[in-house]
Amino acid sequence: KNHALVLDDCMLERTVRGIVNSAFGCAGERCMALPALCVQESIADRFVEKLLEISKELKIGPAYDKTTDLGPVVTESHKKHVEGWIQKGVDEGAKLILDGRGATVSGFENGFYIGPTIFDHVTEDMEIGQQEVFGPVLCIKRVKDFEEGLRMMNDNEFANGSVIYTSSGYYSREFARRTDGGMVGI
């Protein structure tokens, strides 16, 4: 499970666009997808507002259509698997702020489509924020500061990659030095 840490000095629009691409590109079915974010509380509301705005603009459609932003998941059984995880997140009490279940595409009504799905206020004890969903599902964990965000990221057993969004040279260096992610993005 790859993580990003979003600090309050990030370039907001650029950060959100990068995260949307990483979380929802390839329907979230790639090893380097970004399913989990630790967002500094002081920027979280503005971040979530912009994230919803951009995510709702994504065009869902067949993968071969060059205007498509979000294609289908690979199989019907995987669609059911991802939808099961979405329900699990709801049952655990995560705040579902964008629900991609029920997405349809005209002419492809039997396709395996799931729209962008975003949970906010995910806590450390929720499985939705700990396990690999492997679909277009993004979990937001609100954190007080760099230290809490880094700790949450490092406490997760999965760490293909990790990325920080900040304008701070200090936090960039600290992140690169201290993250457990296999690949590091700054």
Enumerate the predicted regions with their spans:
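Conserved C-terminal structural/oligomerization subdomain of aldehyde/semialdehyde dehydrogenase
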Residues: 5, 10, 59, 86, ...
